[in-house]
């Protein structure tokens, strides 16, 4: 069997959509699973909406997710001459024809179809007209001479056998009157020339598959295998849209999700391997196959993604998380200020605090927020809950506790022993002392273990913060 070749073919009119990212992942996994290749084609024929920034965002998003394409990207617009040459082949074979119908005539066809309650279709009026009847003052479009009887059958690797009556498929336009190729034509020619053997894409392209199959046959080319995967819906069952939340991969990066976690989450949207939920990349490549992709739409569950991300954070080494934070910070609000604060000393403190921080955070952004106590300057700002913990009685405890802490060796065990001894001597529960201690040291009611915080901040900074809040 020849090598399997898949492709991901986004339109560069915006960010890398989360649905597109999953399509790219499925193409990549199938190619890697079969020892094949995955190619990237940028479908930039919409010149008004295609931008260099969008192309860069797509490539950057794929790289961030760990999806690597084979070879350089192929740009569809640059291949327009090749697309036109393919149409000339079809004209020469009699499988395409010139159509001179005016926009007004096409509007009338649509209106008649609407009145008769049927789908709008081109009526084929120029299909068999004598070329001598062609008006001299009008540039034609080129249409496919599609079969009018029988069926076009798609043997889809996910959807099964899908049949389209040819009477429902009209003679689609291949070249516009300005000579520019249509999407339908360009996709077929590019997939053929790129050697694509398997087209894996969203099931909203299923009708396109029938039309493109007809173009393949008109050109005398082998039709690739097709797999139309289910769309992603929001938690409410409606097609995923802006009202459900973030749509772009870049937004998930900026919210602090790890690429491995998002990759793992996306692979489970429509594909399964028993009851397993967490997969290493190696396991995904080993297990992935199209016969395990379901037909029904997958629902995007933000809470499940967050929980999975928390799992990946806890499983990451402290060094890996530090590197991930380094990559994230430039994308955060106030990035310049955050970068300026990341001195070698603060970085070392962040590394020391990481074991406790990663146990409590579900995203990198949450982790960075929880680590803010390392970076803030005195006097420490308190959030409302922390301020509420620092009652006059609590502040009095801090004032009496400081001298005891000043006398001990600065280790987690020694400071904990001193605080416990103080609470016992005062006849109060440990929480009555530890909670105000946490509020004074971090400005928040939650943090890594408080005695770890004392070690991260060090003796001088810890005592200074406690004195700031003591009565």
Curated annotation (Swiss-Prot):
It is found in: Cytoplasm. Residues 113-140 are annotated as: Disordered. One of its GO terms (biological process) is glutamyl-tRNA aminoacylation. It is an enzyme of class 6 (ligase). ATP binds at residue 242. One of its GO terms (cellular component) is cytosol. A motif ('KMSKS' region) lies at residues 239-243. SUPFAM superfamilies: An anticodon-binding domain of class I aminoacyl-tRNA synthetases, Nucleotidylyl transferase. A motif ('HIGH' region) lies at residues 10-20. Keywords: Aminoacyl-tRNA synthetase, ATP-binding, Cytoplasm, Ligase, Nucleotide-binding, Protein biosynthesis. NCBIfam families: gltX_bact. PANTHER family: GLUTAMATE--TRNA LIGASE (PTHR43311), GLUTAMATE--TRNA LIGASE, MITOCHONDRIAL-RELATED (PTHR43311:SF2). Catalyzes the attachment of glutamate to tRNA(Glu) in a two-step reaction: glutamate is first activated by ATP to form Glu-AMP and then transferred to the acceptor end of tRNA(Glu). Monomer. Belongs to the class-I aminoacyl-tRNA synthetase family. Glutamate--tRNA ligase type 1 subfamily. This is Glutamate--tRNA ligase 1. The lineage of its organism: Bacteria, Pseudomonadati, Pseudomonadota, Alphaproteobacteria, Hyphomicrobiales.
